[in-house]
Structure formats: C-alpha cells, structure tokens
Amino acid sequence: MTPGRILCALTAFLVGLGGAVAQEPKERPHVQKSQQAQAKVEREAEEMLAAVVRVRMKAIPNARSNTNLGPSREGTGVVIDGRGHIVTIGYIVIEADSIEITTQDDRTVPATLIGYDHASGFGLLRSGAPLGVKPMPMGQAADLAAREPVMILPAGGREAASLAYVVSKRKFAASWEYLLETAIFTAPPTMQWAGAALVSREGKLVGIGSLLVRETQEGELQVPGNMFVPIDLLKPILADLIEKGRRSGPARPWLGLATEELHGHLLVTRVSPDGPADKAGVRNGDIVVGVGADPVKSHEELYRKVWGLGAAGIEVPLKIVQGADVREFKLRSIDRFQYFREKPVY
C-alpha cells in the first residue's frame, strides 16, 4: 500500500469513516484483499493512537513559569520507545512538581521529567509504570514537502484527530530567545496543538506541536495554522536527554528578555524578573538597537549576535534606547537552566 493510500485509510478510520475507504475493484478476491488491507491499517491506526497520551502537570508553587504558563498545564505526549520515554513540548512540563499521563484506555500513571532542551523546546518524560503500548516510530521531517498531507494526533482519541497539510517549512524566530532553523507549519489549525503528534503519510512521527500561529507562510496572504518542532531535532540529543537531562556542549547565553519586531526595531515587551536583563536595568518599552557595535533589527539578528559571543556566562553588550537616551548595557548572561527552579528534594 502506497504512503498516500496509508494516510487515506488512516484518515477514514480515525474520523470514523472506515467503510468509506475505497474498495477497488469489486471482484470478490480483490474485495477480500481490500478488506484485509483495511483491517491491517485499522490495527496500525489503533496502535498509533495508543502511543499518544494525555499529559497533566502541576508546577512547583514558586515556579517562575507560572506567570505566563499557569500552575496547572495539560497537553499531549508521544511514546517513542519501549522504555516508557515520552516526548512532549517542553513548556507543558517545565518546573514540574508532579506529572501524570493518561493512556487511550483511561489508565493514569505518574511520570517524571527526565530531560529538557531549551534550544529545540522538547521535554522528555519517563513513565512510572509499564504502558504496554507500541511506540510510535520516528520518521524524517526533512522529507516533508509543501502541500503534503499529514495527520495531527492530540490526546483524545480518534475524535480529536485531524487531517492537515504542510503549508511551509521555514525558519522560526520567536520573541523569547528561541530560533529554529526549520520549523513545520501546517493548516488548517488544531486547537489542541500543545505536544500533539504530527504524523507523516508513512504513519511515522515527524513533529511535536508547539504553537497556534496566524501566519503559516511568508507574504501578504495570512493562513492560520500550527507550528510543529521537527522530530529530527530530537534524534541527535535523545541519548543526552535520557542520560544527562540536557544536551551536551556549552549552553547558549540567555538574557531573560522578550522582544517584538516593530517597524525594523526590537521593542522589549517582557523582562524576566531577576534575570540578566532585569538586573542590568533593562525595562519594558526599551528598544534594542545593537549588540556591541553591530546593529540588530530582527529576532534572528539579535540571537545570532548574542549566541555568537560565546557560551552562557559571557558578558553581552547591548545598545538600547531607553526613554530619550541611547545607552550601553552590559548583561552578564546565564545558562537558562539556572533561571528555572527545580522541584525540591528532601
């Protein structure tokens, strides 16, 4: 069965239209083969659904992320191996006090956050009890092409599943010191995007849901949809996350400020309390115009200049318009892991 046929059959099954799968032609031997193929796809679809779990998290009481993300969070996770490892989007589980996952057959078991990667945004959990489900195989997000059909699987079973298509694959620079060289943008949007599985025509995991976006493509035509983090970014760091909780190598410098691109300027919209920018005196409403002698006009320019200075701990010289003055600020960057709080161990 071709990849396109697989997705067609999966779509029909997951949305409750199993009988609508084309049965060609009508001679009895072919009908029997078609029924056997459909039964096989339905079994595979059930296994695929079983690998998608609901993630519920309660944050530690003094979590810094509670202000923006709330003390209780919920989303989706995907079982990726036989050892109970579950990948999700990290903002659901950062600064967790407790995490539980619920399977498709309504079993609820505890889970532990064992790895987090700020650069990609992935969070990695480990189930506290055997799940007895077949892991979802990881595919190649790099092979996805524009207009290719995909399936979005949030927690909630077949009723929550939806068919989408790839609108674009392109660079994504966010306001919170986050940059992906290639993100996957899909449409139409799902409202259950957080941690949702993006599944290819081959029935493999190719992305994890991150955001609802107004623009899935560049240009004047706005097409709302979702942004997915490519699963390809997890593969080279998975062993590190399992063994050490984070990727190997020097940490990027983090400043603790969010900016908005506005008419060729970077307007400061949020300063993380007690972060490097806050300690240096940067305030909401300031405008970042340069890193040292180099001008910056976009998120990408800012991040590349800052990250290019060295590892976390490096002093970052920012040129900032504050009020009517252009001032030079020196920010002592930190490893972002230092800022977020961990669950106390007694």
Regions found by a protein language model. Name each.
Residues 72-74, 95, 190-194, 274-275:
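Short, small/polar residue-rich loop motifs at catalytic or cofactor-binding pockets
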Residues 24-45, 133, 159, 201, ...:
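C-terminal cap/linker of serine protease catalytic domains
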Residues 140-141, 196-198, 202, 276-287, ...:
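A short glycine-leucine-enriched loop at secondary-structure breakpoints
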